[in-house]
Each structure stands twice: as C-alpha cells, then as structure tokens.
Amino acid sequence: MKLADALSLIRDIPDYPRPGILFKDITPLLANPTAYSTVIKAFATQIDDVDVIAGIEARGFIFAAAIALEKNAGFVPFRKSGKLPFETIGAKYGLEYGEDEIEVHIDAFANGKSVVIVDDVLATGGTITAALELAERSGAVVKSVHVLFEISGLGGREVIAKRFPNVEIKSLVTS
C-alpha cells in the first residue's frame, strides 16, 4: 500500500472536541493492518540507528512502540503527571486554558542514549518541547522528532527550533 493511500483513511471530524477544532481521527488507519504497517515503515525509514524511541501520551504511544519494534530499539513513554510508578522528572507546558505536565522515569535515558521522540501531532509545540526538555535533563542525545501531522499555522516548529535548534523535525503530513 502506498503511504498516500494509508493516510487517506484518516478522517476529519469537525468541531471535536470543541467548536472550531478539526480533529484528525486515525482509528480507520489503525484498524487496517496494511495501512498501519505502511505508516510505521514510513516513519522507520526516516530514522537511523537509535537506542530508544520515546512516545508522548497518548496517541504518540500508538506509533512510537511499533516504530521501536521495527527499529529494534527500546520504547520509553512520556506520561501525564502521576501515571508512572518509579521516580520521575517532569516538565510543564502551556495549554489554551492552563498548564499540564508530562513525566518520564528518572533513569529512562541513562548513559547518554540516543533518542527519537514521536507524537501524533505537532501543533503549538508545547508538549514536544516539554518532552525535549525532559530528555535533555535526563542526559539523552535527541536525534530527531517525528510526527504524523504538523499543523504549520500554529507555529510549533518555530517554538521547538528556538529552544532546540539542532533537533530535526520530520512530519509525514503537513497542513
């Protein structure tokens, strides 16, 4: 299956989860094993050898764990605050109406492991910037960030580039 055919299975849901938002529903793509595999392989071809693929909760997990298997790499989750059982470090990021926080185990990236960070969407850049900060504080060497969608009009790429100018950002779809 061609990547464009796989991506065509993603449907737009207007006004979800609130008015003015165009939500990208990936469930039809995930339900089709050929399409899902095509997307995972497309991500994997963009990534050189790496120790760890790190995914951001929640939809980033769906892609990151599968990419990690494809690349014979470990998987590390960035979780919402309070969801990890061991000692963690956290980073806050801004939301439209307040703040949220993601965490990672304090030993997730020990010994300067090379890391690729994966999420479903790059919008404002807040969540990915928080993940990059945590990886940096943990001693990881971040090679790149990979997303399924990039919403270019929201400035996320620029936010990340300002704080992390040497981190490459790759997206399969840009709108």
Describe the function of each predicted region.
Residues 1-175:
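PRPP-associated nucleotide enzymes
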